[in-house]
Amino acid sequence: MAAHKMSLTSLFFVSIVIVLSLFSGFGEGRYIKYRAIAKDRVPDCTQDPKNCVRVPVNQYHLPPGCQNTTHCYREKYHI
């Protein structure tokens, strides 16, 4: 009786594993499209036009006490 009960339990477990393995592959992505990683492209620009606006970066902003010539060298190395 115990061997029969064990075989039903193992059969149930194996069948659950098979069913779950069949359904696990439906939602995964197979590859990344080159559009998604293209240079100079804002993601989701076609779906939401609000995301298409790029915010310009201030290249000349330095923290207080820094100069363009030293680039905070004195603060890093305590000169």
Swiss-Prot record:
<dbReference type="GO" id="GO:0019722">
    <property type="term" value="P:calcium-mediated signaling"/>
</dbReference>
<keyword id="KW-0325">Glycoprotein</keyword>
<feature type="glycosylation site" description="N-linked (GlcNAc...) asparagine">
    <location>
        <position position="68"/>
    </location>
</feature>
<dbReference type="Pfam" id="PF05498">
    <property type="entry name" value="RALF"/>
</dbReference>
<dbReference type="GO" id="GO:0005179">
    <property type="term" value="F:hormone activity"/>
</dbReference>
<keyword id="KW-0964">Secreted</keyword>
<keyword id="KW-0732">Signal</keyword>
<comment type="function">
    <text>Cell signaling peptide that may regulate plant stress, growth, and development. Mediates a rapid alkalinization of extracellular space by mediating a transient increase in the cytoplasmic Ca(2+) concentration leading to a calcium-dependent signaling events through a cell surface receptor and a concomitant activation of some intracellular mitogen-activated protein kinases.</text>
</comment>
<protein>
    <recommendedName>
        <fullName>Protein RALF-like 35</fullName>
    </recommendedName>
</protein>
<feature type="signal peptide">
    <location>
        <begin position="1"/>
        <end position="29"/>
    </location>
</feature>
<dbReference type="InterPro" id="IPR008801">
    <property type="entry name" value="RALF"/>
</dbReference>
<dbReference type="GO" id="GO:0005576">
    <property type="term" value="C:extracellular region"/>
</dbReference>
<feature type="disulfide bond">
    <location>
        <begin position="45"/>
        <end position="52"/>
    </location>
</feature>
<keyword id="KW-1015">Disulfide bond</keyword>
<keyword id="KW-0372">Hormone</keyword>
<dbReference type="GO" id="GO:0040008">
    <property type="term" value="P:regulation of growth"/>
</dbReference>
<comment type="similarity">
    <text>Belongs to the plant rapid alkalinization factor (RALF) family.</text>
</comment>
<feature type="disulfide bond">
    <location>
        <begin position="66"/>
        <end position="72"/>
    </location>
</feature>
